[in-house]
Regions:
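A well-structured
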Residues: 1-278
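C-terminal, non-catalytic "cap/extension" segments appended to globular domains
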Residues: 115-117, 227, 318, 354, ...
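Glycine- and acidic
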Residues: 122-123, 179-188, 228-234, 269-280, ...
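Long, well-ordered alpha-helical segments
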Residues: 196-213, 251-255, 359-369, 390-407
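Inter-helical turn/loop segments and adjacent helix faces that build the functional surface
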Residues: 230-231, 254, 258, 298-301, ...
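Post-HExxH zinc-binding segment in Zn-dependent metallohydrolases
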Residues: 242-243, 367-368, 379-407, 415-416, ...
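Auxiliary, metal-adjacent structural segments of Zn-dependent hydrolase domains
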Residues: 274-334, 347-348
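Active-site recognition of the HExxH zinc-binding catalytic motif
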Residues: 342-368, 389-390, 394, 432, ...
């Protein structure tokens, strides 16, 4: 069924909550393990209609944040979502109280029971009103960001549409693009500062109600992190600071030499090559045709997947006024259909987001068709889910010539370099958020000062050259995740560590790398991050010294593939 044929009906929340109570009672009373397993499948399916409606509403809202009907529907889910989540938690609580609960681990793997425990520990009826307030705060941020229109080159442009100007070979054009963006954020400075303060206050209040010191502690439960905690993440960040950042300084020196920009400033960083960055082929149809060929040749599984996605028009990837920034993949369970949202802006990032979101969607497509996988275990934890997407970016490399033509080698270098450099920025975002939630009384200026300190730690090569907004340390405010889903961002770093290993493996044996990836994908959400890495034969980055060798291999490859 094509996307525009999918019908939306606002769900009956009362009926759903009553059904949840019934399922919780059944779970508590299940007489044996077989009955409990059957009931787990039943409760997992019970939310399919609600989740389909919620995701349809969110797709339509983010595609046009100005549409009053879909804004009202999004408000409905913002208001009612916490009650539904809490009802789901009560079902988990009932499963955990059943003496046969260990059967679920035997059937569904280590994440099932551990995930239910996290769900119980992460939710509380006393926080429902605070959760509703948080959802409203996020919607306000999305409206500020999604409604951004700036004047440049005689045009009204969205933030994503500034992308090509930021990569222009004329430094004055680049500076003007960044200043136009900065002007918009500076104009909303007071509101953005106030919003973030309210978000920190809100989430810390939720944490304290539930007995946690602050939200940085609660987040590990809410993010369903299984098998590791704050100490492992701190060790990971330390390894990046000590073993990756020094290598990145070499990489940035190579970039400066390659571009001929002797003393690059922040607005020069998007320039990767003297003659301009790689450009993908133009045109929606041409790109989609290339994607179909690419996925048909990659594997039978991806061929079936891309046909389903394109034939059912499950993409909205072109930027336009009123459309929310960013990119995502979501699922429509009633139709067993993934959906991909993006904002193409005629830069190489268009291919990044296409292959990235297709990685998410491919895993969802495979899991939805495996009858052994319950609906709520189709996707693993977020740090693992990002492996599917980031690794797909690299594993499609043999076909990138279809999308870049003569710029293919430039894109290969840019993509590998950007992914490697990203590790530092991702750790910076994570450490910043830990500081913010552990020090909630910081003033807006003090928050910005902390960000600038972390810039020196993780990205010491950056010179902001008195650029408005960024130069005062407020650049973090354009990072959607910091407002919308705190503490998510480190997941991109953990998955990047897996993706870089897939990249290095593919250089010597692409077929083997793909088969390892498929094994990982087929475990769906029924294995933890460390188990998934072990399934694919990859190193776990929490172990001391595990990153150093990978960082050296990446630097060596980048040094020998300068274009």
């Amino acid at each position: 069924m094509k996307f525009n044929e999918m019908t939306y009906t606002r769900p009956d929340i009362g009926a759903l909550l009553a059904r949840c109570k019934e399922l919780a009672a059944k779970a508590a009373a299940a007489p044996d393990g077989d009955a409990l397993v059957r009931l787990y499948y039943e409760q997992s399916e019970a939310f399919a209609e609600y989740n389909t409606a919620a995701n349809l509403a969110n797709i339509h809202y983010t595609c046009d944040t100005r549409d009053e009907y879909w804004k009202a529907e999004q408000d409905f889910f913002d208001a009612n979502g916490p009650a539904v989540t809490n009802a789901s938690v009560e079902i988990s609580r009932a499963f955990l109280a059943n003496p046969h609960v260990d059967v679920l681990t035997a059937k569904f793997g280590t994440t099932c029971v551990a995930g239910m425990k996290n769900a119980v520990l992460g939710m509380d009826d006393r926080t429902v009103e605070l959760q509703q307030q948080f959802n409203a705060l996020v919607s306000r941020y999305q409206q500020i960001y999604g409604g951004a229109l700036v004047e440049l080159d005689g045009k009204q442009l969205t933030i994503p549409q500034l992308g090509p100007y930021k990569e222009d070979l004329d430094p004055a054009v680049r500076r003007a693009a960044y200043e136009a963006e900065a002007g918009y954020f500076d104009a909303h400075r007071a509101e953005l500062d106030e919003l973030y303060g309210e978000i920190v206050k809100n989430l810390n209040a939720q944490a304290r109600v539930m007995g946690y010191h602050d939200y940085s502690e609660l987040s590990y439960v809410r993010m369903n992190r299984i098998g590791y905690g704050p100490e492992e993440i701190r060790k990971f960040r330390d390894q990046v600071a000590n073993d990756v950042v020094p290598q990145l300084q070499k990489v940035m020196a190579l970039r400066a030499k390659r571009t001929g920009i002797a003393r690059p400033t922040f607005t020069d960083l998007p320039i990767m090559f003297k003659d301009g960055n790689p450009k993908p082929i133009p045109g929606y149809k041409a790109r989609m045709d290339a994607a179909r060929t690419m996925y048909h040749e990659l594997s039978p599984e991806t061929a079936e997947f891309i046909d389903f996605m394109q034939d059912n028009e499950l993409f909205d990837v072109e930027s336009r006024p009123g459309k929310m920034s960013g990119g995502y993949m979501t699922s429509l369970p009633s139709y067993k259909a993934p959906f991909i949202f993006a904002n193409w802006n005629n830069t190489s990032g268009d291919v990044d987001v296409l292959t990235h979101e297709c990685g998410h969607a491919f895993e969802g497509y495979v899991a939805e068709r495996d009858p052994e996988v319950p609906a709520d275990l189709e996707c693993p934890g977020m740090e693992s889910a990002e492996i599917h997407s980031m690794a797909m970016e690299f594993l499609t490399a043999p076909w990138h010539h279809l999308l870049f033509g003569r710029d293919t080698d430039k894109y290969a270098l840019l993509h590998a370099e950007d992914s490697f450099v990203f590790l530092a920025y991702g750790c910076e975002v994570d450490e910043f958020q830990h500081i913010m939630y552990q020090n909630p009384d910081l003033t807006p200026d003090e928050r910005n000062a902390e960000w600038l300190k972390l810039e020196k730690k993780y990205r010491p090569w950056i010179d902001f050259d008195n650029l408005p907004f960024y130069g005062r340390g407020a650049g973090w405010q354009r990072q959607l995740h910091i407002y919308e889903c705190p503490f998510y961002y480190i997941d991109y770093c953990l998955s990047t560590m897996a993706a870089l290993q897939f990249f290095l493996l593919s250089l010597t044996d692409h077929k083997d790398a793909w088969q390892r990836y498929l094994r990982l994908v087929r475990r769906a959400g029924m294995a933890s991050y460390t188990e998934l890495l072990e399934t694919a034969g990859l190193k776990v980055p929490f172990e001391e010294g595990s990153i150093k060798g990978i960082a050296q291999q990446m630097t060596d490859w980048l040094e020998t593939h300068q274009v």
